[in-house]
Amino acid sequence: MDGVSFSVAPGEIVGVIGPNGSGKTTLFNSILGQIKPTSGRMRFMGEDITGMSPLALSRRGVGRTFQTLQVFGSLSLRDNLIVAAQEFVRGMPSRLFAAPDAGLGAQADAMIALFGLERVAHLPAGSLSYGQQKLADIAMAFMPRPRLVLLDEPCAGVNPGLVDGLRELLLHLNKTQGGSFVVIEHNMDFIMRLCPRVICMVEGKVLAEGAPEAVRSNPAVLEAYLGN
């Protein structure tokens, strides 16, 4: 990445688009401490988080999803949600070894109902379809009620007929939990309908930033992202 600089306001939803290799995932991994930047700084709620570990970020209220699903196949979907919330307080080992916290059961049940996963809530997550695991993975990111959520390709693997429903879910969570979202997504229509502000990256740089229609109609974006 080179010269990438932007801010996200409390409660704001920002979309990041761009062709493969544009630096979107590198951006996420840098924020999450998976990659240490060679220069530049990142700040969250006034604190310098450059190079901070994923656990430390989680405890400061940063949630995330990755392209690789984070569900534990041997645990029920419901228990996956509960231990995801425990990570915020106790750290990553709790996701593997801690007994489920009964006090989080009601919160998990509410999230399961919101995502329409009641029928599979008590099944091992590994037995669910990819789309169901994807929804569970997204739900897990919201269990600790984070202040900032980084969503990497939330539409990937989701039935096209459910994409609009996923958008409504994210808007609902944004309204009810009040956190900020940064969303990476190849589905431009999804981003344009979800995010009031869109950033287009190309070759590690910000090519365009602004309102959805302004970015969509930018000739440089059309050439770089759509190949026209």
Where are these regions (language model features)?
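The feature captures the beta-strand-to-loop junction immediately N-terminal to the Walker
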Residues: 17-19
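Helix-to-loop junction immediately C-terminal to a conserved catalytic motif
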Residues: 32
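Conserved ABC transporter NBD signature motif
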Residues: 40-47, 60
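Conserved ABC nucleotide-binding domain
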Residues: 50-51, 111-129
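Conserved ABC ATPase "signature" region
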Residues: 89, 94-120, 161, 168-171
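Conserved catalytic motifs of ABC-family nucleotide-binding domains
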Residues: 145
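Catalytic Walker B motif of ABC-type/P-loop ATPase nucleotide-binding domains
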Residues: 149-153
